[in-house]
């Protein structure tokens, strides 16, 4: 039996992959499905192919295939294509365009005048990379779809109880999990997909250096509701991203804008959930200056958690009876069904971990 601890994007996707392959699976989640205590909630996460690293460009292609596989299995649309823009005084789009070209990813390099004609509601003053395959992932619907299909494929789900004990048996061939409601679950393999809660678990293995931060996101109403906004990556004095909000922004069309960095160090257990007013001021100022198609005062805001490694790569590795499938360093949502497949492969002995995702990698 394989136990999966954590039913966020990674854990839910792993349980779905394992169950659809016919394995005996128990999924354990401390909170409700879709809870707000981690990193996997909300209606809007960016999917993009544009990375300044050929490794991740290739990986996004594999992830796109897995998204369509999940949508087909769940009969639920989860990834909405919008196109995406990369720009900013510190984001040279030309090297990224070269990587996309090498991977046969459709894209355009645009002068500011041409880009401004196409997206007049964005103030564009430099070169822009556009790639049409970018889009928006609904995290809430994805988690719900994965859990539902995992159960329909035969998985057991234990929801609303925390794992309080993890003991490797003397033979090292089984792991005993204890939960706060008194259950004892014996598994041959345990997939840990706890995200920001990972450092709180008492695991018999060494974890890499991790930083948990509280991030803030803000939703700004569109001045013209009929405009179709792309996703945005902006690197300059500020490092921001933007994308259509979905239901998180309320009943009228909104765009989510947030800083990718400048999070506040915290832990999953001690986070305040209080939005940082200095971040609100910076992001609102950016919207006022660069996104004239949005009203500059946010109509909704929220916090979430990043769990980041030193090199900002993921951790997807096996150590004895454990598979560690988190953290995702603030850019893992777009890869969720692919990471689930990787973790399932490790849990069943079908593959070796990628060197960049190993627990003991340098850095």
Regions found by a protein language model. Give the residues of each.
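Glycine-rich Rossmann-fold phosphate-binding loop(s) that bind the pyrophosphate
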Residues: 6-10
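C-terminal catalytic lobe of FAD-dependent flavoproteins
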Residues: 286-363
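Glycine-rich FAD pyrophosphate-binding loop
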Residues: 19-40
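Helical element adjacent to the flavin cofactor pocket in flavoenzyme catalytic cores
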Residues: 130-188
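Short beta-strand to alpha-helix junction loop
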Residues: 58-59, 86-92, 130-148, 274-279
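Dinucleotide-binding Rossmann-like beta1-alpha1 core, especially the glycine-rich loop
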Residues: 44-118, 125-127, 239-240
């Amino acid at each position: 039996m394989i136990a999966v601890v954590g039913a966020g994007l990674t854990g839910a996707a792993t349980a779905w992959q394992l169950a659809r392959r016919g394995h005996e699976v128990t999924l354990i989640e401390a909170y409700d499905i879709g809870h707000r205590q981690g990193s996997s909630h909300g209606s809007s996460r960016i999917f993009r192919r544009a990375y300044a690293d050929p490794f991740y460009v290739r990986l996004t292609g594999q992830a796109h295939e897995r998204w369509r596989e999940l949508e087909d299995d769940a009969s639920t649309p989860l990834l909405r294509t919008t196109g995406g823009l990369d720009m900013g005084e510190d984001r040279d789009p030309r090297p990224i365009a070269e990587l996309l070209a090498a991977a046969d990813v459709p894209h355009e390099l645009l002068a500011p005048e041409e880009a401004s004609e196409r997206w007049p509601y964005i103030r564009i003053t430099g070169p822009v990379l556009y790639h049409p395959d970018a889009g928006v992932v609904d995290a809430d619907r994805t988690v719900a779809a994965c859990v539902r299909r995992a159960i329909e494929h035969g998985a057991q789900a234990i929801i609303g109880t925390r794992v309080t004990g993890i003991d490797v048996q003397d033979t090292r061939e089984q792991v005993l999990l204890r939960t706060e409601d008194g259950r004892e679950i014996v598994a041959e393999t345990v997939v840990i997909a706890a995200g920001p809660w990972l450092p709180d678990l008492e695991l018999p293995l060494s974890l890499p250096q991790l930083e948990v931060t509280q991030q803030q996101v803000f939703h700004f109403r569109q001045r013209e509701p009929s405009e179709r906004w792309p996703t945005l990556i902006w690197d300059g004095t500020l490092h921001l991203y933007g994308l259509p909000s979905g239901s998180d922004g309320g009943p009228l069309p909104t765009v989510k804008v947030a800083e990718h960095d400048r999070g506040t160090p915290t832990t999953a257990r001690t986070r305040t959930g209080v939005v940082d007013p200095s971040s609100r001021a910076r992001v609102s100022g950016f919207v006022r200056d660069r996104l004239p198609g949005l009203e500059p005062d946010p109509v909704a805001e929220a916090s979430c958690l990043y769990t980041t490694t030193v090199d900002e790569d993921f951790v997807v590795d096996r150590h004895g009876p454990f598979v560690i499938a988190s953290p995702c360093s603030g850019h893992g949502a777009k890869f969720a069904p692919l990471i689930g497949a990787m973790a399932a492969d490790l849990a069943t002995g079908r593959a070796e971990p990628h060197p960049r995702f190993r627990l003991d990698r340098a850095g």
